[in-house]
Amino acid sequence: MTDYQNDDDGFVSKSQRKRDMDALQDLGRELVDLSKDTLKKMQLPEDLLTAVLDYKRFTANGALRRQMQYIGKLMRDVDPEPIREYLKVLKGESSEHIAWQHLLERWREKLMADDKALSDFLAAFPEGDPQQLRTLMRNARKELQDNKPPKAYRQLFQEIKALIPEPGKPRLWQKDEDEE
């Protein structure tokens, strides 16, 4: 009589492999929807980047289907998690990104409410330009008072955004910016 052992540790069913490959193709579909500049910022492997850009050139349905399968095949050699994280950040879905945006909004509200908040902000972020921030605060308050479009209010937000770095932004396969 044969003694069968349960060797589940290395076994993946054919159905599971197909589901995994479909998930990689779906991730590839998300990549082909991105702009060329965004794709280049991601620093994808050269063959995958070329395949995604080629997909955008094709118009025949059969060619698009084959190219998407090829993209799925190339995705097998790439760790998909950094790509998924980057796409989440682009969509603004990551909890860290949302918390960062809320932090920016809180600082803007503090600065709009009280002039003394500027010294607190500059203590936390000393690279800020106090004169520029003070001018934006004054102009934003005046716009709010005169019921004008919030141009300076938005500029103040952009200035704060430039000073407070976004936490956990995935770097994927990027080289150090000092080396470029």
From Swiss-Prot:
Membrane spanning residue stretches: none
Pfam family, one: DarP
InterPro entries (alphabetical): DarP (IPR006839), DarP_sf (IPR023153)
Cell compartments where the protein resides: Cytoplasm
Keyword Cytoplasm appears in the UniProt entry: yes
The entry's keywords: Cytoplasm, Ribosome biogenesis, RNA-binding, rRNA-binding
HAMAP family: DarP
Name of the protein in its database record: Dual-action ribosomal maturation protein DarP
Organism of provenance: Chromobacterium violaceum (strain ATCC 12472 / DSM 30191 / JCM 1249 / CCUG 213 / NBRC 12614 / NCIMB 9131 / NCTC 9757 / MK)
